[in-house]
Each structure stands twice: as structure tokens, then as C-alpha cells.
Amino acid sequence: MLSVAILAAGKGTRMESSLPKVLHKISGKSLLQRVIDSCVELKPDQIFVITGHKSKEVEKSISNEKKIHIVIQEPQSGTGHAIQILCREVKKHEGKLLVLNGDVPLIRPSTLKRLLYLHDSKNADVSLITTKKRNPHGYGRVFLKGDFIERIVEEKDCNDLERENRLINAGVYCFNWGKLSEIINTLRSNNNQKEIYLTDTISMLKNSLSLEVEDNGELQGINNRIQLSECEENMQNSIKEKHMLNGVTFINKASCSISEEAEIGKDVIIEANTHLRGNTKIKSHCIIGPNTFIENSYVGLNCEISNSTVYASQIMDYIKIGPYSHIRPNSKISSFSKIGNFVEIKNSQLEEESKVNHLSYIGDSIIGRSTNIGAGTITANFDGEKKHQTKIGKNSSIGANTVFVAPINLGESVTTGAGSVITKDSKDNSLAISRTQQVNIENWERKKS
């Protein structure tokens, strides 16, 4: 039986934030959620999240997770105290207990599996992950005696000689839960921090083993915004390197961010300052950017999107968008269409070969195939209470500065005169025009003030 305990009760004072530390995000997911995701890969029988500071916020953030049990630690008196509370609340202490911090978001499932394998193969009382750091400041030092761990000394309790040891405790443990439960309540806060340390159990258990892993960033704990930024950078480098090896070009890799869920096809060029968020999919031979933000959207083959934002929409094949366009949720731009500069599309569908080239707002609309929308066109979709739809049939030509007062339905091959305010439906092959006749008054003189 495998149980997991994730320590997430701390205040995270050094983050200087009103948000609990474990709820800060790396590439769109909270630190805690990333740790949970790694642990789920192990297929544990149960997962305990031990929380304390702003526990309701933490619990709400993971409310959709299955097999998660919340344990409240009050007051927060150290890692050992957290496990004491867990052991009191859980009656059966069977099998293995994996304990890790909620602020190590890059921990890999494969590393955790290696730890579990070592623990099982050696029938250990406790096994933990260690690594050697060039600068071990802030970490507990691990001291070995032969193949076994003799003791762990926390940074603030180290003397000068002990601080020279570069082998550190990564804060990831696998215990024989039965043996741990026999000694856990004997722990005391006899240290400079006046906290109950889980590390004190190491010297009390006979068969204590170390799994030393390379310091490659996955064990980085997050205590401040600098470390949060470093962790984000490590994550982003890993994501972008994967895409580059699969045929994606980044013009300025450091200025871009890509979500883990994003899919990018071969021969896509990602220009500078481009950000792909959420479940975004980019098909092959696209040029995305510069200065472009796409979230939870589909982009088809051979598209170009420049200096624009796209949210929760579908951009089909061979489409050009931008610069300075805003595609809002629930929009679909069909193949061979063009969205030009300073255009906003919202909850609308444009059929194939349609064009909205300049300075227009298209909201709650259906635009037919091969229709051209002139500069400055507005669909006035809101009457103060409700949104209404505009429908324009295929092969239509909409004059510049046309305003459609929805709800309205235009047939196929309709033309509107420039500057018209269209308030009535129009049939196929008609001209709709609504404007006053121009009057020129000769010899006009403006009044002088």
C-alpha cells in the first residue's frame, strides 16, 4: 500500500504575498497542483494534503481532485509536527508513506519511482532523496556512514564545519509507515527553530538510505519570488527545447512562454514575445508573432498571426490575422480569410474567403463566404439589455463605416453604401443605403468668436 503526504501548511513568508505559497503558479499550474500531478503518476492508494495557513483557499484549489484528503495542521510547528497530526488522524499505518513538500513543482514521477524502488529493494525503514549543491545554503545537510544516513542537520543548526558539507536533503522521504508511527510522537522541538523536525526520525530508524540524484533543477524548492522565477525558467526551457527538437523555430526563445498542454506542428516559426497558453494547438507551417497571445485556441495550417490576441477560438487554414487584432471567445475564422489591423471579432463565425481588413467590430455575427467588410464597420449588437445577432450572406460587399443595428439579416450578394446605418433586413442582390443627402452651401463663413 502506498500513501502520500504533501506538506503544504507553511505561510511562505518570504514570498511577500497574501496568496499561500503553494498556490503560486509555474506555467499556469500551482506549485501544489504540480506536486499532486507527479504523485498521481505513482497510482497511490491515498493522498493527504497537510495544510494550515489559509487552508480553505488551498482546499478549494484542489477540490476537484480524487483521492485527496485534507489534514489541518494548527499551529504550524514543523514538518515532524505535521506527520504527528497525520498519524493521529489516520488509524491504519500500513505500507509506505511518501512525504514531500508542496513547493517542489518540478519533481519528476520517474525520480519518485526510483526512490520507491530503492526503498522496496533494500527493505528500508526510510529512504530519502539527496543531491549535491554548489551552494547548499538554506538546506539541511545529510551525513552518511557507509551506505546509510547517520543524521540530517538543518542549516540553522549547523556549525561551521557541518556547513561545508554539500550533500543536502531534498525533502522527499519514503517511510515504512508502521515503523515511523512507532517513533513519531517521541520527536521534540529541541533546536534553534523550536520546531519539530521530521528529519530527526532519520537517526532513530536503523535502515536509512539515500538516493542521490543530479542537481538538475527538479528538486528546487520555492521560498521566494527569485526561486519562483528560476523554476518558471527551467520549466519553460524544457518545454521549448522539446518543441525545437520536434521542428519548431523560436526567433527569441527567452521572450516567449508556452504552456505544457500546447501542441505545435512542424515548421512553425514562433516570433519574439509570443505566448501560447492553455490547450492551444498550432498546425504546421504557421508564423506566430511577434507580440502575440493565444489561449485555448486552434490555429490551422499556414496561418500568420501578428501582434494580436486570440482567446478560445478556431482559426482555420491559410488565414492572416493582424496586426493589432483581437479575436474573442467562441469565434471561428474559416479558411482563406483575412482579419486586418485594429479589428475585434467576438462570438462570431466568418465563412471561407471573408475579409475584415480595417478598424471594425464584429460581434455575435455570421458572415457569409467571400464577403468583404469595409473599414469602420460596426455590428451594434447590444440594446442595453440583450445581445442580438447580425447575419450577412455570402458574396456581400459592406461599405466603409456601415453600422448594423442588430438583430438584422442580410441576404446574399448584398451591398451597403458607405456611411449607412442599417436597421432593416435586406434581400439577396440588393443595395442597402441609409444616409442623408449631401448639401453644399457655397460661400460659407464660419462664425468668428
UniProtKB/Swiss-Prot annotation:
Q: What is its EC number?
A: 2.7.7.23, 2.3.1.157
Main location, first listed in the record: cytoplasm
- Region annotation (Pyrophosphorylase) maps to 1-225
Q: Which domain of life is it from?
A: Bacteria
Q: Where is the active site?
A: 358
Cite the Pfam families for this sequence. Hexapep, Hexapep_2, NTP_transf_3
The residues listed in the UniProt record as binding Mg(2+), with positions renumbered to this chain, are 103, 223
Query: Which residues bind acetyl-CoA per the record?
Result: 375, 418, 435
Named cofactor requirement(s): Mg(2+)
Q: Which residues bind UDP-N-acetyl-alpha-D-glucosamine?
A: 7-10, 21, 73, 78-79, 140, 154, 169, 223, 328, 346, 361, 372
Enzyme class (EC, first level): transferase
Q: Where is this region: Linker?
A: 226-246
Q: Name one GO biological process term.
A: peptidoglycan biosynthetic process
Instruction: Identify the PANTHER family for this entry.
Output: BIFUNCTIONAL PROTEIN GLMU (PTHR43584:SF3), NUCLEOTIDYL TRANSFERASE (PTHR43584)
Q: What does the record give as the function of this protein? A: Catalyzes the last two sequential reactions in the de novo biosynthetic pathway for UDP-N-acetylglucosamine (UDP-GlcNAc). The C-terminal domain catalyzes the transfer of acetyl group from acetyl coenzyme A to glucosamine-1-phosphate (GlcN-1-P) to produce N-acetylglucosamine-1-phosphate (GlcNAc-1-P), which is converted into UDP-GlcNAc by the transfer of uridine 5-monophosphate (from uridine 5-triphosphate), a reaction catalyzed by the N-terminal domain.
What's this protein's name?
Bifunctional protein GlmU
Organism from which the protein derives: Prochlorococcus marinus (strain MIT 9301)
